[in-house]
Amino acid sequence: MITPKKIQFANIPTPLEEIKFEGKSFLIKRDDLTGCELSGNKIRKLEYLLADAKRQKADIIFTSGGDQSNHARATVIAARKIGLKTKLFLWGKDTTSPNGNYFLDKIFGADVQFFSEKEYENVNDIMFEQRMELLKKGKNAYAFPGGGSTTLGIWGYINFINELKEQIDLKKVDSIVAAAGSGGTAAGMLVGAALNKLNVKIVAVHVLMSKEEMRKQILQLAEGCVLDYK
């Protein structure tokens, strides 16, 4: 597969910690240590997405999420690091006293537009329409969905498998377990495991979609990535 370019943001490799519980051994991959203000798995995807945004000479970044979205916060801060502003399309209600991630979004200069739950169902269409309006004005907005889960973004977790392979013998690992919100982390690990010819089970614990919807999303991302970068 053709490996896309990325911008190095994350402090990697992240460490592994072993715990034992009821006679079983578990290894915890500390991706919460990728970087203080960019903590978690979000930055691995953003390294590829923002590199592509720079390549396409974007003027502004569009992305979406909840009013306390970790992905949104990480996007705003990472984009600032390379001189780009972000507009966030968030589900929830505005407040006169921002807190948590929304406070950080505002501190780092994000433009924010809020939507009701019903309106948010069409958020990708709304971002596209606003992107087209900016294009008419000579401005280039680079948009990606909540979670950064695109066929490009999941390269962050294809590379994660390569990193993990250097730390442990993955042939001795039965399963890799991760929470699954938008499916990108699991999809990337699935492709990474296949590329490395590993017989390891990828377990995605769905936290937003139904089991069936999550499975479909993961497979679509994985198959799309293979087709896009073969």
Question: Where in this protein do the model-derived segments appear?
Answer:
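PLP-dependent amino-acid enzyme catalytic core
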Residues: 1-230
